[in-house]
Amino acid sequence: MAPTLATAHRRRWWMACTAVVENLFFSAVLLGWGSLLIMLKSEGFYSYLCHYPDNTTYHNSTGNETNQELVMDMNGWLICKEQDEMLNLAFTVGSFLLSAISLPLGIIMDKYGPRKLRLSGSASFGVSCLLIAYGASNPNSLSVLIFVALCLNGFGGMCMTFTSLTLPNMFGDLRSTFIALMIGSYASSAVTFPFIKVIYDLGVSFITILIVWAACAGLVFFNCFFNWPLEPFPGPEDMDYTVKIKFSWLGFDHKITGKQFYKQVTTVGRRLSVGGSMKNPKELSALQNGNKLCLSTVDLEVKCQADNAATPSFMKSVFSPILLLSLITMCVTQLRLIFYMGAMNNILEFLVEGDMDTVSLYTSIFGVLQLLCLLTAPVIGYIMDWKLKDCDDGKEDADEKDTNTDGKKKKKRDRQIQKITNATRAFAFTNFLLVGFGITCLINNLPLQILSFILHTIVRGFIHSAVGGLYAAVYPSTHFGSLTGLQSLISALFALLQQPLFLAMMGPLEGDPLWVNVGLLGVSMFGFCLPLYLIFYKRSLERQRKQKIEDSKLYLKINGTPDHEAFV
């Protein structure tokens, strides 16, 4: 039996804490591809593509050599460029699905809620672990299972991530901070495979590790089954779980929040009160045409807007400049980050001239640094929430705490303008870090790559948190899942370019990533388009607010009230 929204609200801290842990170990673990790649090679996945050519130079992972042409092995299995290309293709497919599946998931989640998706995701993740374990039992015949396993892994991981992004709706003004925390745990999940590699290096069987991991995914399934509600979590503007019940006896065939119910009842009551005072057919027809009359006088008529008039349509949100520019930013950033993750081991091999022990060491360092996302992602969330508590929340009544010592009301910031200001800072800062990361990648210095690891980790945590916070701030909560999914799908399609870039690096460029990195650095400059537009958008909002204040003063002189009304 699924819990109600009121029950889920009481358990929100438990759900948030477990969601962070579950994201850390069961969401985007595929982002730790460098460590998984080493283990897959050690278990012989696609090793049958490698052969000893004539005049070979044998080179194992400890550095012992004979003869001329280089051939290496790992844990007794041959490794080669053809194997790298095939496994990188599997990573490309899995990472694509990790993002591309977001759009249908977002649409489904907005309509049906997160519970069923999270149950499906945890089950898919467990099955993916079992498939990898089965493939490792006979890699010469079952290596192809890695494609199916990584697809299920990507699907399950995105289900876990996406559903956790609905939880921050229960935390009010801290929503962006909690979104950042969820995305931080998602980004930090890249540490999972490096952690598993440490256990693997201690001598634990790869198959045993995966079976235990699949069993842990079962615990995630049961946690969701007993704690997550069927209904979607409403946004903070509709938050009132204590009175959320089903009013079927009032003619509502859906569940509504207390605030929505209050709005429905007061609207109906107002229309009944005004309608009862009407005497002639003309006034009645005005009511039937969708107009409402103020209770104070029948002569004061105000056009009644439909509820959806205040909320932009989904297509209007899709074609808004903010969303389109955010797509450009995410496409560029996603390609830059995904290419580095997929090619990192080969880039390190190029720098150390094939020393696999050094490559393994730096891969482990990269994995450990992924935990930085848990610390850095909330920073961008804090930037997105900066000074929102000091903003005008739209209430007309001033509290005592909102007045100065001389009794005058404090001048508050506009909430929408403050959100745009915060988003501008977040995206500008993130893109500067992305450019810095691109510059460090151009320098062929091994110790400097640790700085590249740090910048890569910070940018990956920042960009997703910034986009999630921006969408939560600008667009209706009912569109959040669909818009985030659309953004993920388009950026995932663009990130497929990492496979031809990888083939170009391994083929014509002979393993040298210099020119690929130069091109990606140039493309990264497009990321500054979004913060520049947000600056102009903020100025437009400031002009509108100034005009609104001047209009309110005019109405105050005419009607004695700042409301935009006029007596007939």
UniProtKB/Swiss-Prot annotation:
Glycans are attached at N55, N60, N64, N422. It comes from the Eukaryota. Pfam families: MFS_1. The keyword Lipid biosynthesis does not apply. GO terms for biological process: isoleucine transport; L-leucine transport; methionine transport; phenylalanine transport. It catalyses: L-leucine(in) = L-leucine(out); L-isoleucine(in) = L-isoleucine(out); L-methionine(in) = L-methionine(out); L-phenylalanine(in) = L-phenylalanine(out). It is found in: Cell membrane; Basolateral cell membrane. Gene3D superfamilies: MFS general substrate transporter like domains. One of its GO terms (cellular component) is basolateral plasma membrane. It is a multi-pass membrane protein. Glycosylated. Keywords: Amino-acid transport, Cell membrane, Glycoprotein, Membrane, Transmembrane, Transmembrane helix, Transport. The keyword rRNA processing does not apply. GO terms for molecular function: L-isoleucine transmembrane transporter activity; L-leucine transmembrane transporter activity; L-methionine transmembrane transporter activity; L-phenylalanine transmembrane transporter activity. The chain crosses the membrane at residues 20-40, 89-109, 119-139, 142-162, 176-196, 202-222, 322-342, 364-384, 434-454, 461-481, 489-509, 516-536. Belongs to the SLC43A transporter (TC 2.A.1.44) family. Uniporter that mediates the transport of the stereospecific L-phenylalanine, L-methionine and L-branched-chain amino acids, between the extracellular space and the cytoplasm and may control the transepithelial (re)absorption of neutral amino acid in kidney and small intestine. The transport activity is mediated through facilitated diffusion and is sodium ions-, chloride ions- and pH-independent. This is Large neutral amino acids transporter small subunit 4. It comes from Xenopus tropicalis (Western clawed frog). The gene is slc43a2.
